[in-house]
Amino acid sequence: DPVIAIEPGGKVVRSWGRGRYVMPHAIRVDPQGNVWTTDAASSHVIKYSPTGAVLLDIAVGGQPTPCRNNFCGTTDIAFAANGHLFIADGYANARVLEYTPDGAKVREWGTPGTGPGQFNLPHSIQIDRAGVVYVADRENARVQRFDRAGTFLGEWTAYGKTFGLEAD
């Protein structure tokens, strides 16, 4: 099973997700304790209860080339204070998508490229307490910063090919 719950002392409490993944990529826990995962190969984003029941599967189906209308290589997820979910759709689509807690798409931003607001593999995403969205644009060797509506705020370029982020 690709999802395993372990107590602080190291005891495995439960596991789940067998047969649901081709290439599991990210796992995050939302403020309510639900477990969210991404699968970069099948391009699903799945929400589980803390006990492993599937609560939501944002499934887009196949991956037609060039994948722009569907997820195509989801890499990470982050949660806004209002409960919205932000998804880094990185391996082929080079964009960020925002969804409501029940899976309705709100907006997206980003295109392939090297300019501000463009991506070459958005690999990780986080949102800080002020609502700033940070995207690790791995192959452009930078972290870009946006407001929640996708307006470019700036970038950091001194840290190499960042593949993971964590907000504090």
Located regions from the model:
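Eukaryotic scaffold repeat domains enriched in small/polar residues
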Residues: D1-D168
